[in-house]
A protein has these predicted regions:
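Short, polar/flexible loop-turn hinges at active-site or ligand-entry regions and domain interfaces
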Residues: 35-43, 62, 143-147, 166-170, ...
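Metal-dependent nuclease catalytic cores that hydrolyze phosphodiester bonds in DNA/RNA
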Residues: 1-134, 176-178, 189-192, 279
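Charged, terminal alpha-helix-loop-beta segments
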Residues: 100, 188, 192-197, 237-239, ...
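Short amphipathic alpha-helical segments and their helix-coil junctions
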Residues: 5-10, 25-38, 136, 144, ...
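Contiguous, amphipathic alpha-helical segments that mediate oligomerization or scaffolding
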Residues: 253-284
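Cysteine-cluster motifs in flexible loop/terminal segments that predominantly coordinate metals
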Residues: 26-30, 212-254
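Glycine- and charge-rich intrinsically disordered segments
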Residues: 1-10, 241, 246-247, 254, ...
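Mg2+/Mn2+-dependent nuclease catalytic core
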Residues: 97-218
Length: 284
């Protein structure tokens, strides 16, 4: 294995890639959720185990089935997990054939002078010297929600970080960047492996500028709150005043002006989900 800590023990940036779609859309959510415990769900822990298995397969050059019955991060490697992870491993190896593969590529965005430390780890990064193309691949183990690849803030964040790391550490300067999502447990009409390609300038300048502007907005004392589909994974959803206002407005529209709204803290996760769904915030 690598000298990286286990996936479950890795540090996470307050303005990280996995939550980028939330804090870009709702800058105030960062300050509102400060100090709140990030309690991992069983689904998230299982996804972490799948990522650990994928890394083991790539580093040891083994099939996922070679680890059947082993326990990783508290989860047994089952045939279903091995089958799903193998889809990702095969996709990475296909893309890496004849090229240079970097597994679990760590990066930071300090070269961009962000307002707070911004860093992360890309699952797999592949350099194609002939085409001057950098490919960043991301395993998504979730089965319930389709993950988009086109203009994804999370994947673009990973790609930007990987590109900066390649420039600084290996003197690699791509002209094109390909971003690939591998989601083997979701039956997407476009398949388990989906990709999106852009020119390096768009990522290095245009996306980077937008990302930094959003990062600076999160540090403002009056950073705005903006409810949306990103609320579903926000730690502060139960105490968010804007989400509460949304609940009150919807309830009064359904009932009458004498409706007594609940306190934000009393809203269950199911109630919050229902509020967002009724507001037509969960599209696609």
């Amino acid at each position: 294995m690598s000298n990286l800590p286990a996936h479950a023990n890795r540090a996470h940036a307050s303005l990280g890639a996995s939550s980028a779609s939330r804090w870009i859309a709702c800058p105030g959510s960062v300050r509102l959720s400060e100090g709140m415990p990030n309690i991992s769900t069983d689904y998230a822990r299982e996804g972490t185990a799948a990522h650990e298995l994928a890394e083991m397969c790539l580093r040891k050059n083994k099939m996922a089935t070679a680890f059947l019955g082993q326990e990783i991060e508290g989860f047994e490697v089952t045939e279903d997990m091995a089958e799903a992870v193998q889809v990702y491993v095969d996709a990475v190896l296909d893309e890496a054939e004849g090229n240079t593969l970097f597994i679990e590529q760590r990066f930071n965005l300090q070269a961009l002078n962000p307002p707070v430390p911004m860093f992360g780890t890309a699952d797999a990064v592949i350099w194609n010297e002939d085409e001057k193309r950098l490919t960043v691949m991301d395993l998504k183990y979730g089965a319930g929600v389709p993950v988009k690849v086109e203009n994804s803030p999370q994947l673009s964040y990973y790609a930007l970080g990987a590109m900066l790391a390649m420039e600084a550490e290996r003197n690699i300067f791509p002209t094109r960047v390909r971003m690939v999502i591998v989601q083997p447990r979701y039956r997407h009409p476009n398949g388990y492996v989906r990709q999106f390609e852009i020119d390096a300038y768009s990522l290095r300048v245009e996306f980077a500028d937008d990302l930094l502007a959003a990062a600076h907005r999160t540090q403002e004392a009056d950073a705005p709150l903006s409810p949306g589909d990103h609320c579903r994974f926000c730690l502060a959803q139960a105490k968010c005043p804007k989400l509460h206002e949304q609940a009150v407005a919807l309830a009064q529209a359904e009932f009458d002006d004498n409706f007594l709204p609940p306190e934000p803290e009393s809203l269950s996760e199911a109630q919050i989900g229902d509020i967002l769904a009724k507001a037509d915030l969960f599209k696609g």
